[in-house]
Amino acid sequence: DPLLPWRRARRAYGVFLEVMAEAARAFGAYLLAGSLLSPPYEEELARGRFSRTPFFQNLALFFNPKGRLLAQVPKMELTPPERWLRRGRFGPHLVETEAGKVGILICLDGFYERHLARLDALGAEILLQPSANPAPWERPWPPDPARKEGEVWVASAQARLLGREHLRLLLNPMLNGEVAGLGFQGRSGIYAPGEALRLAQAPTGDEALLLRL
């Protein structure tokens, strides 16, 4: 069936949407569910759920505490294994909520200064950067083997908010475990300008990071 990938994607999107909306309602919290490889879908009264494009993207879905989908955010900068995906365009990456203005950049997007500067100039106060790094946390960092991967990651996150007009808080949840034959490691963190406020104790395994502001 040549259309099987799209049929599966539509079903997976529906399940993902329903489960994450339910989780947001259950916890009464804003929830960023990232990420999902799928065409972006819309809903309209007569047509139901549909997509305007057949192209797959790397998408993060952002929900409010009532389980309402606020934004469907596409990744803009793609890694070599993602080159079969369609690059997203800037747009839904800034969301104004009752808790403040939230910027969303998926993994690699958050390392590009032009995306950070744009969100900061638009007034984003909180940056959400869901990440998946398929590399050992303690390996030598390829551009500078004298430093370790994790060391560079944390230092970069601490520096990312320095000197900004509005950005004050960075939440960087990191995928751990085996997915599609790849091993992912990373210490999730909550950062302020120049410092890590909370860091997961290890680059593998599950851990909840809580911060009272």
List each model region and its residues.
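Glycine-/acidic-rich phosphate or pyrophosphate-binding loops and their flanking alpha/beta elements
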Residues: 86-99
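CN hydrolase (nitrilase-like) catalytic-core segments centered on the catalytic cysteine
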Residues: 12-32, 110-208
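A charged helix-plus-loop insertion that forms the helical arch/lid used to bind
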Residues: 1-6
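A short, polar/charged loop-to-alpha-helix boundary motif
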Residues: 75-89, 206-213
